[in-house]
Amino acid sequence: MLKITVNNGFRNLRAGDVYDLTDYTQLKSVCVVGENGCGKSSLFQALRGMKNDAATSSLYESDFKALASNITVEHDYEKIFYFDRVKDNGTDFQVAYDASGFIESGGFYTKSKSHGESSMVYIDKFLSKIIPNIVEDKTLIVLDEADAGFSLTKQKQFANLVYHLSLVKKADVIVISHNPFFICSSILAYDFTKKKAVSASDYIREVTGFNISKVETV
């Protein structure tokens, strides 16, 4: 189960707001959608500050912990892991221990790669750390805009990766995304502003006026 209550308003989140994803996480993978600035990342950063089983030396970790005091969380997960495209993209590995490990992985050579290629390197590094620690049906993985900048090929790889984590590794996966391809390939879209599940195609049509059929991953 996963239910987050905002006790003190912060950023664009209001005191008293309740985000109950319990019924939706039973589907194993959920895509959280909403406008820029509606509070999606802020809410899950606060959750990250409360429980993160892959804590790093990122300079942002103390900020996340400060946000955690604004929420109350009910969950039954033994492990919770996070990947944030902006906060975990390699630029904050400023402690020697983390830096040495990153060099060994080839991570610092990403400056010669495209944005999408670099992002995939960071995601692969993140997953190599957490996959051995996944507890079946008791692990939550939050991927925050990890698919930004991906080509269609990379988007397909990312969608299949999410399904692998949820269906093979038996982890619950929450993906925050603005990517129409991933939204339409999702089992479910959770409208953050409306706090309820929506049809992916209906959501895209409501926001853009475009009709997009559901994407079937292979």
Predicted regions and their residues:
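N-terminal pre-Walker A segment at the start of P-loop NTPase domains
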Residues: 1-20
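Phosphate-binding P-loop
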Residues: 18-27, 133-136, 167-168
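Generic beta-sheet signal
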Residues: 28-32, 139-143, 171-173
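ABC ATPase nucleotide-binding domain signature region
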Residues: 31, 41-107
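P-loop (Walker A) phosphate-binding loop of NTP-binding proteins
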Residues: 35
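GG-anchored amphipathic helix commonly corresponding to the ABC/SMC/Rad50 NBD signature/C-loop
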Residues: 115-143, 153-165, 175
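Short loop immediately C-terminal to the Walker-B catalytic DE motif
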Residues: 147-148
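C-terminal lobe/lid and adjacent interdomain/linker elements of RecA-like ASCE P-loop ATPase modules
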Residues: 153, 157-218
